[in-house]
Amino acid sequence: MKKLIASLSFLFIWNCANAQDPVDYVDPFIGTTNFGTCNPGAVCPNGLMSVVPFNVMGSEDNTYDKDSRWWSTPYDYTNSYFTGLSHVNLSGVGCPEMGSLLLMPTAGELNVDYHHYGSKYEKETASPGYYSLQLTKYNIKVEATATLRTGLTRFTFPKGKSHILMNLGGRADQ
C-alpha cells in the first residue's frame, strides 16, 4: 500500500510540475490567412490597444496587397514584406480602411517610400500580449507588447544611422 501511495504521489507531483497554463495553448496565428482577418499582434483581452504587424502593402511578392485590391486586414500570414506596426487595428474585423498609423524602424540612408523602406522578415514569434520579428534588410529586432490601456514597441538597431518612420496612411504617390 505504501508503494502505491508513493507511486501515486510521485505521478501527481510530476504531473503538476509539467502542467501548462491555458495561455500556453494559445496560437495567435490562427485566422491570419484565407480572409480570417485576425492578426498575431500584441493584444490584451478586452484591452484598448493592439500593436499589429502590417504586411499588406509595398511588395509584389505579397499574396495580398491593400493597394492592388480591396483588403481589410493589416496582416496576412502568407505575406512576407513588413512596412510597420499599426497601433489602431482590431483583430477579427480588419479595419485598416479607417486608417492605419504605422511605425517602421529603418537603418542606413533615409527613404520614406514604403515600396523601398519595407523589409522582408524572419524569426516571427507571437504569444498573448507579445509579438516580435527580425527585419532582414536592416537587421533590426522589432518587439511589441500590450496591456489593458497601453501598447509598447521596442526596436533594437544595429550600430549606425537609424530612423523610426511614421506613416500616416497615405499611399506613396500621394
Task: Go through the PLM ranges and name each one.
Residues 1-20:
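Bacterial Sec-dependent N-terminal signal peptides
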Residues 20-174:
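Accessory carbohydrate-recognition regions in carbohydrate-active enzymes
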